Curated annotation (Swiss-Prot):
Disulfide bonds: none annotated. Allows the formation of correctly charged Asn-tRNA(Asn) or Gln-tRNA(Gln) through the transamidation of misacylated Asp-tRNA(Asn) or Glu-tRNA(Gln) in organisms which lack either or both of asparaginyl-tRNA or glutaminyl-tRNA synthetases. The reaction takes place in the presence of glutamine and ATP through an activated phospho-Asp-tRNA(Asn) or phospho-Glu-tRNA(Gln). It holds the Pfam family GatC. It comes from Natranaerobius thermophilus (strain ATCC BAA-1301 / DSM 18059 / JW/NM-WN-LF). Belongs to the GatC family. The keyword Ribosomal protein does not apply. GO terms for molecular function: asparaginyl-tRNA synthase (glutamine-hydrolyzing) activity; ATP binding; glutaminyl-tRNA synthase (glutamine-hydrolyzing) activity. This is Aspartyl/glutamyl-tRNA(Asn/Gln) amidotransferase subunit C. Keywords: ATP-binding, Ligase, Nucleotide-binding, Protein biosynthesis. The keyword Metal-binding does not apply. Its EC number is 6.3.5.-. GO terms for biological process: glutaminyl-tRNAGln biosynthesis via transamidation; regulation of translational fidelity; translation. It comes from the Bacteria. Residues 55-83 are annotated as: Disordered.
């Protein structure tokens, strides 16, 4: 299915996007490609398949927490250009 220039401009207007001619053509191609893929999916025989939101049945798969050795404060701060107490000191970026 070919998406028209007018359809791309309509969607751009809904999204308050200002597209130039090159972008309109690019989106025409991309949206047309997406719709062609959807048409291919529509051809699949899905009779007897249950609707699903996920390909796998797994839910909330977690692992046990494991304690690992970590750096001491002194070791972590060893190569820092500036420190203040037990913290890295970094330049202020917000006034």
């Amino acid at each position: 299915m070919k998406v028209s220039k007018e359809e791309v401009l309509h969607v751009a207007k809904l999204g308050q996007l200002d597209l130039d001619q090159e972008e309109v053509e690019m989106f025409q191609d991309k949206l047309s490609q997406i719709l062609e893929w959807q048409e291919k999916l529509d051809e699949l025989d899905l009779e007897g398949l249950e609707p699903t939101a996920h390909a796998l049945e797994r839910r909330n798969v977690t692992r046990e927490d494991q304690v690992h050795n970590s750096l001491t404060n002194d070791k972590a701060l060893e190569n820092a250009p500036e420190t203040e107490g037990n913290y890295f000191k970094v330049p202020r970026i917000i006034e």
